[in-house]
Amino acid sequence: MGAAKKINYKKVLRDLVPINALSEAHIDEVTRKTTFEDLRSGRYVFRKGDRDYQSVYLLEGTIELIGAAREVVGTVKAGSEDALHPLAQKQPRQLSARASGKVTVARIDSRLLDVLLTWDESAGYDVVEIDAHDDDDWMTRMLQS
C-alpha cells in the first residue's frame, strides 16, 4: 500500500454519500480522519470476505469488482455516480475490488460515519415540553367555551 500524494480532498469528500449529509464541522472531522491511498494496477483495495469496517471511496482511476469465481462483475470509474457511494459496502465484503491502473482511494471508518450521522440527525430534532395543566392551551379554552 503506497502513500497517497498530499492533496486536500475535502471538496471531493463533501460530495460523497452519506458524507454530504453531515454538518460542516463533521465533514472537517471526517477529512482529518480519512486515509488516502494510492494503489498500483493489479493491487487489491479489499478482498471478498474482509470485515474491515471501512467505507472505501474511489477518488481517481478505475476499480474492477471481482466475484466469487474471480471474474470481473463490474467496474467503477472515479467521477461516476457509483463512485459517489462506498465500494461494495456490505460487511463481510461480498466482492473483491482490484485497481485497474493507478487508483486513489479514501478509507473512512464506517463506525465514525455512523456516529457522526446519528449526531447530525439528532441535532435536527427539537424537543418541546407540553404542560398538560396549562390553562392557556387551545384545547382547554375550546372545552371551556
Features from the language model and the residues they span:
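Short, flexible segments with low predicted structural confidence
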Residues: 1-3, 27-28, 34, 69
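Cyclic nucleotide-binding regulatory domains
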Residues: 18, 43-102, 113, 133, ...
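A short, N-terminal "cap"/entry segment at the start of jelly-roll beta-barrel domains
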Residues: 1-11, 15-25, 141-145
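Hydrophobic residues at beta-strand termini and immediately following loops
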Residues: 37-39, 76, 108
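Short proline/glycine- and basic residue-enriched helix-capping loop/turn segments at helix->loop/beta transitions
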Residues: 18-41, 92
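A small-molecule sensor/coupling module
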Residues: 9, 26-29, 87, 92-95, ...
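Residue-level signal for pocket-adjacent positions within structured domains
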Residues: 8, 14-17, 34, 40, ...
